[in-house]
């Protein structure tokens, strides 16, 4: 796996799923391929994106700044600086300085990532802030190792939280989760169907599913009534794709 592929993988792992994730993936690909060279416009676009947490925006801003060539005097962006200040906690800053000294001795991406993984996400973000604010310099490879370690820490805690929700025995939470998943699957079906004539059928299935979820929420239904809703939808989507000559088995 190439270095940039690895960086893209880690960074996208902390972005919530949805149309915005697809858009960010495209920007990252363009930046890494050298197709997008306007850092100013890129940062302005990032700053105004909804849904993303300030820290995720800060990490993306850091990655864009590392990758896109820019004039030396280009201003650092406040939204990135604020996100990478370790919540203003002096302990984070102390640890960040110690980590920075260790990173200065590293020359490889994997070496830097290994060293960084033993620190908390707050200290890692502060260390990125040091480098972003030009208070310290490391090679781009080492900076990317720091980015990936930070994303791994964040993704780990997101995964723990997600697992808690998925394995919860509370029927109301499970019911709502199934309806949310069915609704987002329906939305994805509508987007994939596009505007071709054969798409009417898939659109109809998706639309009915969304109406059904709406009705279930409006009148309040038994928690088990949503079981299988998303799987039924995905089966419909796969049947539609087969007719269109597209084979995609990996939805479940």
From Swiss-Prot:
GO MF annotation list: RNA binding; structural constituent of virion
What Gene3D superfamilies is this protein classified in?
A: 1.10.10.180, 1.20.91.10
One GO location term (cellular component): virion membrane
Any single Pfam family the record assigns to this protein: Flu_M1
Would you kindly state one Gene Ontology biological process term found in this protein's UniProt entry? Answer: viral budding from plasma membrane
Q: Which UniProt keywords apply?
A: Host nucleus, Membrane, RNA-binding, Viral matrix protein, Virion
* Principal cellular location given in the protein's record: virion
Q: Where is this region: Membrane-binding?
A: 1-164
Task: Note the SUPFAM superfamilies from the entry.
Answer: Influenza virus matrix protein M1
* RNP-binding: annotated segments: 165-252
Q: Where in the cell is it found?
A: Virion membrane; Host nucleus
- Entry keyword annotation includes Membrane: yes
| Motif interval(s): Nuclear localization signal | 101-105
**Membrane topology (UniProt):** Peripheral membrane protein
Further comment found in the protein's record: South Carolina isolate has been sequenced from formalid fixed-lung tissues of a 21-year-old male which died in 1918 at Ft. Jackson, SC. Brevig Mission isolate has been sequenced from lung tissues of an Inuit woman buried in the permafrost in a gravesite near Brevig Mission, Alaska. This sample was recovered by John Hultin, retired pathologist. Most abundant protein in virion. When expressed alone can form virus-like particles in transfected cells.
Q: Which family does it belong to?
A: Belongs to the influenza viruses Matrix protein M1 family.
Q: Which HAMAP family match?
A: INFV_M1
- What is the stated purpose of this protein? Plays critical roles in virus replication, from virus entry and uncoating to assembly and budding of the virus particle. M1 binding to ribonucleocapsids (RNPs) in nucleus seems to inhibit viral transcription. Interaction of viral NEP with M1-RNP is thought to promote nuclear export of the complex, which is targeted to the virion assembly site at the apical plasma membrane in polarized epithelial cells. Interactions with NA and HA may bring M1, a non-raft-associated protein, into lipid rafts. Forms a continuous shell on the inner side of the lipid bilayer in virion, where it binds the RNP. Determines the virion's shape: spherical or filamentous. Clinical isolates of influenza are characterized by the presence of significant proportion of filamentous virions, whereas after multiple passage on eggs or cell culture, virions have only spherical morphology. Filamentous virions are thought to be important to infect neighboring cells, and spherical virions more suited to spread through aerosol between hosts organisms.
Subunit description = Homodimer and homomultimer. Interacts with NEP. Binds ribonucleocapsid by both interacting with genomic RNA and NP protein. May interact with HA and NA. Cannot bind NP without genomic RNA.
Please identify the protein, giving its name as recorded.
Answer: Matrix protein 1
């Amino acid at each position: 796996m190439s270095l940039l592929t690895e960086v893209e993988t880690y960074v996208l792992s902390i972005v919530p799923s949805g149309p915005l994730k697809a858009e960010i993936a495209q920007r990252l690909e363009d930046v890494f391929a050298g197709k997008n060279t306007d850092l100013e416009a890129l940062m302005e676009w990032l700053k105004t994106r909804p849904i993303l947490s300030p820290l995720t925006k800060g990490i993306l801003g850091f990655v864009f700044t590392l990758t896109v060539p820019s004039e030396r005097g280009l201003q650092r962006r406040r939204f990135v600086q604020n996100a990478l200040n370790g919540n203003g906690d002096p302990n984070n800053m102390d640890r960040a300085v110690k980590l920075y000294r260790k990173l200065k001795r590293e020359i490889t991406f994997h070496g830097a990532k290994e060293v960084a993984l033993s620190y908390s996400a707050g200290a890692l973000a502060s260390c990125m802030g040091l480098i972003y604010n030009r208070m310290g310099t490391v090679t781009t490879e080492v900076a990317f190792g720091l980015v990936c370690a930070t994303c791994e820490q964040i993704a780990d805690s997101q995964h723990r939280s997600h697992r808690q929700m998925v394995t919860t025995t509370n029927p109301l939470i499970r019911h709502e989760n199934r309806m949310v998943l069915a609704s987002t699957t329906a939305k994805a079906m509508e987007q994939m169907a596009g505007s071709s004539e054969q798409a009417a059928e898939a659109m109809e299935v998706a639309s009915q599913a969304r109406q059904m979820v709406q009705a279930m929420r409006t009148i309040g239904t038994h928690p088990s009534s949503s079981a299988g809703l998303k799987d039924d939808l995905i089966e419909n989507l796969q049947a539609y794709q087969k007719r269109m000559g597209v084979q995609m088995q990996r939805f479940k």
